[in-house]
Design a protein with these regions (language model features):
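Active-site environment of divalent metal-dependent phosphoester hydrolases
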Residues: 22-25, 74-77, 107-111, 163-167, ...
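Mid-to-C-terminal alpha-helical segments outside catalytic/metal-binding sites
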Residues: 1-17, 24-58, 62, 66, ...
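Histidine-centered catalytic micro-motifs
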Residues: 14-24, 158-162, 200
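Catalytic pocket-lining loop regions of alpha/beta-barrel enzymes
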Residues: 125-126, 140-250, 295-296
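Active-site gating/metal-coordination segments in enzymes
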Residues: 66, 74-168, 177
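Short, flexible/disordered intra-domain loops and linkers
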Residues: 31-38, 45, 77-80, 167-180
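Generic structural signal for hydrophobic
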Residues: 59-60, 119, 150, 189
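Conserved, mostly hydrophobic/aromatic
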Residues: 18, 119, 127, 150, ...
Length: 298
């Protein structure tokens, strides 16, 4: 099934640029059981149910919000078969009034470029990478053909940056290396691919200052605010949101790990110019997705 937009972007209140589909339509989980348990413990999720695509869609539909949905193909590095991206795209197509699918490819597999092309043909609107889980340095030129294919399709690429809850608390972090998610590696990619829109996912602790500098320096680089409640944002990031990052920051939760209602409540408690809110919650995401920003009549 091919995805096409069915969203009334003028009517929705927010675009969450960062949500995970944990379980595919076949009941397969995106991580193995040990990693699932550790991740849920890290985020203090308790009995919160795993999110399938249809459940996620209804959750956002009830809140008049749109969700970008994805999974992560890290089979080579993690030894765990990924969720079906075709299943995710089909689920987004069923719920195209509220969901936007991003693709995923394993950069370490020879068919990565071909997989990009296949998923573009199915209608994905961007691609998600997790360098630490996928065990690759984004600025290694071996992976540049992947970015060439994404750039040629006119789509954005979203990269995990900074600390990760995946593997946290386990011996050796389950083998996951944080250095792959240093945003300075993406500075190289952004310079070498000026026509590729890049989103750095999460406040990139412990590299937040570098992340702010990169987003401010390069017009093709944005950052999303997922993975943390806004009340835990580093103070320099909060300052930047009202200044140099007001047109570069995107609303994102990391759902189901961070719930939308909690994130919005904590964001509203920040001392920010009210004019910044519509930029972060919707308008900046529309620009990243290559969509027009609706104007309000009157």
């Amino acid at each position: 099934m091919t995805y096409e937009y069915g969203i009334d972007f003028a009517a929705v209140e927010a675009i969450d640029i960062h949500t995970h589909v944990e379980v595919d339509g076949h009941g397969h989980n995106s991580y193995d059981d040990e990693l699932v348990d550790a991740t849920r413990s890290y985020f203090k999720m308790g009995d919160t149910a795993a999110a399938g695509v249809d459940e996620l869609a209804e959750h956002y539909r009830q809140r008049n919000a749109v969700a970008v949905v994805f999974t992560i193909d890290a089979e080579t590095a993690m030894g765990h078969a990924p969720n079906s991206i075709e299943d995710l795209i089909a689920g987004a197509a069923r719920n195209n009034d509220v969901l936007i699918p991003f693709g995923t490819v394993d950069p370490l597999q020879d068919r990565a470029v071909q997989r990009v092309r296949e998923q573009v043909a199915l209608g994905v609107k961007g691609f998600k990478f997790h360098p630490s889980m996928q065990a690759f340095e984004p600025n290694d030129r071996r992976f540049y053909p992947i970015y060439d294919a994404i750039t040629g399709a006119g789509l954005p690429a979203l990269f995990h940056t900074g600390q990760t809850g995946i593997g946290s608390g386990l011996p050796g972090g389950y083998g996951i290396k944080l250095r792959y998610s240093d945003p300075m590696l993406l500075d190289d990619v952004a310079a070498d691919f000026p026509d590729l829109t890049i989103v750095m996912a999460h406040p990139a602790v412990p590299w937040v200052d570098a992340q702010i500098a990169i987003a401010a320096h390069k017009s093709n680089v944005y950052l999303d605010l997922s993975g943390y409640s806004p009340k835990y944002f580093p103070p320099q990031l909060v300052r930047a949101l009202g200044r140099q990052l007001r047109t570069k920051a995107l609303f994102g939760t990391d759902y189901p790990y961070i719930q939308l209602d909690r994130w919005q409540k904590d964001f509203d408690a920040l001392e920010l110019d009210p004019a910044v809110r519509p930029l972060i919650f919707k308008e900046n995401a529309l620009r990243v997705l290559g969509l027009p920003v609706p104007t309000i009549a009157g």
